[in-house]
Curated annotation (Swiss-Prot):
Its EC number is 2.3.1.191. Catalyzes the N-acylation of UDP-3-O-acylglucosamine using 3-hydroxyacyl-ACP as the acyl donor. Is involved in the biosynthesis of lipid A, a phosphorylated glycolipid that anchors the lipopolysaccharide to the outer membrane of the cell. Homotrimer. It comes from the Bacteria. This is UDP-3-O-acylglucosamine N-acyltransferase.
């Protein structure tokens, strides 16, 4: 099977070159040429693969890879190796060396719309039917694919990737190396209404912006609402999966991970390295501390301290939830034991009444 991480066929590295670039040690022939990366099962004779656990050693008997990335614990394998403390991280960086972004012709496609007072940096590529509104600034090396939309006054940094159909609405700010995938809308109105005396909903204009810092990646079909005032802020290095909703005035901390279908209500703040697993719901106006983790489908209704693990609906500390769940699993047994105990008490009472 052809590697999905194999780039330009002219791009290749020797094992020793990769070791130097990736900070790994070579075991075996340093002159081996590598032209891509792949899984153990599918790797071709000129590709690099990886193994992180001894459980996968049986796969090596059929592996055709030119070399394998391993941890020091597996450095004695009879195979050309790159040895690193964090083999999975090294594999990810190797994949980046070979991966090529989807093709986009350099320059501005004649079918794109470029508004007045737009500044495009050196090496910017703009695809067909893309729309770049007035007063936008786009940094060098950024790729704006077909049908992407930038509203008036948007600022986009260097080497960003805006995929087809990505929407960045007016005045929003993107840092450097930001990736926004198809169907995502950055800067839609926050959900803000006041109820009058007759129960009618009066819209509160959402006049703030969204600020996305360097090295953020946002998946497909996400929505990041603009602030009521000030900014909704996604801080440096955060990674956001598909179909995530981030409400107005939310702050996402540095290097946070938000897995698919997470929803975060307004004015909530996440610390750095927070992990929200799939379908987590977070109430508004609370704080989740640095390195806290919330398990899938949990509902968080109160602030969470740094380093806490949360599970369940409503979310509680993981140990408490596990104890509760274990007891739920025993309910049928408890019920039967209680029934027998009640019957025993009734027999004793009946015997006592007969004396």
């Amino acid at each position: 099977m052809e590697s999905c991480f194999q780039g330009d066929s002219r791009k290749s590295y020797s094992l020793s070159e990769l070791a130097e670039i990736l900070g790994a040690a070579v075991r075996g022939d340093p002159a081996i040429r590598i032209r891509g990366v792949n899984s153990l099962e599918d790797a071709l004779p000129d590709e690099l693969s990886f193994i992180t656990d001894v459980r996968y050693k049986p796969l090596l008997s059929k592996c055709r890879a030119a070399a394998i990335i391993v941890s020091p614990a597996l450095a004695e394998l009879e195979f050309p190796l790159l040895v690193a403390e964090r083999p999975y991280v090294v594999f990810a960086r190797a994949a980046q060396l070979f991966a090529e972004p989807p093709f986009l012709a350099p320059g501005v496609h004649p079918g794109a719309y470029i508004g007045p007072n737009v500044h495009l940096g050196e090496g910017v590529s703009v695809g067909p039917q893309a729309h770049i509104g007035e007063d936008c600034v786009v940094g060098p090396g950024t790729r704006i694919y077909g049908s992407a939309y930038l509203g008036p006054g948007v600022r986009v940094g260097e080497n960003c990737m805006l995929y087809p159909g990505a929407v960045i609405l007016d005045r929003c700010l993107l840092g450097n190396r930001v990736t926004v995938h198809s169907g995502t809308v950055v800067g839609s109105d926050g959900f803000g209404y006041a109820q009058d005396e007759k129960g009618r909903h009066v819209k509160i204009p959402q006049t703030g912006i969204v600020q996305i810092d360097d090295d953020v990646e946002i998946g497909a079909n996400c929505t990041v609402d603009r602030a009521t005032f000030g900014r909704t802020w996604v801080r440096r290095g955060a990674k956001i999966d598909n179909q995530v909703q981030i409400a107005h005035n939310v702050v996402i901390g540095e290097h946070a991970i938000l897995v698919a279908q997470v929803g975060i209500s307004g004015s909530t703040t996440l610390g750095s390295h927070v992990v929200l697993a799939g379908q987590v719901g977070v109430a508004g106006h609370i704080e989740i501390g640095d390195r806290a983790r919330v398990g899938a489908k949990s509902g968080v209704h109160h602030s969470v301290g740094a380093g806490e693990d949360i599970l369940g609906i409503p979310g509680v500390p993981a140990r408490e939830w596990k104890r509760t769940y274990a007891n739920i699993q025993r309910l049928a047994r408890f019920r039967e034991e209680l029934r027998l105990l009640v019957e025993k008490v009734q027999r004793i009472e009946k015997a006592l009444d007969g004396e």
